[in-house]
Amino acid sequence: MKKYKVIYADPPWAYKVWSRKGAGRSAESHYPTMSIEAIKALPVGELADRDCALFLWITFPMLREAWCVMDAWGFTFKTVAFVWIKQCPKSDNLFTGMGYWTRANAEICLLATRGRPKREARDVKQVILSHVERHSQKPEEARRRIEVLMGDVPRIELFARTSPPGWDVWGNEVASDIQLAERS
């Protein structure tokens, strides 16, 4: 099996919906979601090179669960790689999303490692100010920054929606380059 030095993942987290009004805007109304146990059961660690960086998108209500996922996949948390401050699709105003207590307008991408992956650049910025596109689609700028930060190494995007040049992909919205089945 091919091993990767960069794994970029945006799991389809399942959220508790507290009202009928929120149900229409929830992740479940846009794409199939996965339970935390199902996400943890994916054999992502088997894809990882001895020295590998994991970039894991999460929303703030999933912080605790993200640590469980990183542990299950064999990675150790290092830092927040990116903070995406969302702008409205057609203006530079800040986007107002859903939220359990406050209205969310940011997502974070955690950086975790296995071994000692090599950082190629020291000037990659953390904050990404970018417009929202379709539900849960992450800004292309994040992928570009990962490429600069980590260099031209074997890399894969899990739960991918597109097939960018230089990346292997896996997901239900793309022609996957690998097979990835749950561990038994």
Please report, for each region that a protein language model flagged, where it lies by residue.
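Class I S-adenosyl-L-methionine-dependent methyltransferase catalytic core
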Residues: M1-S184
